[in-house]
């Protein structure tokens, strides 16, 4: 009898562990979006944009046209996928809060219509599935929490503030039709959907294709 109970208990534990792992190991991956942006030859219909913020910086002054050439932007055609970097008109509500905020902004599409986005412990989840992408986790200059604290001189930073940043959390938000959820690549250096919620499709001006060749 004792042996039978032991076997049943073992099976119960194994099943419980298996079921628990399903909820934590399901992931959404992005194998199409490159972390490094290349150059493109602009066409007549394309926009050439200057961007002087470090909000998208992953360690190489990314997207910053003070270091790189102008950004080539394809006018919005109604088609977007996760990982796309878009050029959009900042929401009036944010401009009213900060008069120094740029009226035209960049952000990366993270959540699409009918998806639920949340952030827990610095990690983005889509419909409760971990977003396994370079832009799906809190970074600073492209460095993850572990990489950052191994690299920086702790005497030069506020460790408590950076710990808090790398553990950023946000309540779930359902992405409505005709909207997207956007994030900058260096969350603490820019304004995005963590601040203003969903971005209306009508605010999107275009998609960044690359640096001008």
Per-range role (PLM):
Residues 112, 181-185:
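Active-site neighborhood of phospho(di)ester-bond hydrolases with catalytic His/Asp-centered motifs
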Residues 2-102, 170-172, 189-213:
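Protein maturation boundaries and topogenic segments
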Residues 42-44, 117-122, 177:
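A short, compositionally biased
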Residues 154-177:
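Alpha-helix-centered segments that form part of catalytic cores
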Residues 102-133:
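Mid-length scaffold segments of soluble, non-membrane domains
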Residues 70-73, 87, 118, 125, ...:
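Hydrophobic beta-strand signal
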Residues 130-155:
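Acidic, glycine-rich loop-and-strand cores that form catalytic or ligand-binding grooves
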Residues 76, 91, 122, 129, ...:
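Surface loops and adjacent helix of pleckstrin homology
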């Amino acid at each position: 009898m004792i042996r039978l109970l032991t076997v049943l208990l073992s099976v119960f534990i194994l099943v419980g562990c298996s079921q628990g792992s399903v909820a934590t190991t399901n992931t959404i991956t992005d194998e199409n979006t490159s972390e490094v942006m290349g150059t493109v030859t602009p066409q007549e219909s394309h926009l050439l944009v200057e961007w002087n913020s470090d909000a998208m910086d992953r360690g190489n002054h990314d997207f910053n046209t003070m270091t790189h050439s102008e950004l080539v932007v394809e006018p919005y055609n109604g088609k977007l996928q996760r990982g796309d970097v878009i050029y959009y008109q900042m929401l009036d509500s944010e401009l009213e809060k900060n008069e120094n905020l740029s009226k035209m902004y960049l952000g990366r599409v993270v959540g699409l219509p009918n998806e639920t986005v949340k952030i827990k412990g610095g990690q983005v989840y889509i419909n409760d599935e971990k977003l396994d992408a370079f832009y799906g986790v809190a970074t600073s200059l492209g460095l993850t929490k572990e990489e950052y604290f191994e690299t920086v001189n702790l005497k030069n930073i506020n460790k408590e503030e950076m710990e808090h940043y790398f553990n950023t959390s946000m309540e779930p938000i359902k992405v409505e039709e005709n909207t997207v959820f956007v994030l900058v690549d260096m969350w603490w250096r820019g304004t995005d959907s963590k601040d203003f919620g969903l971005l209306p499709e009508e605010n999107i001006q275009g998609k960044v294709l690359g640096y001008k060749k």
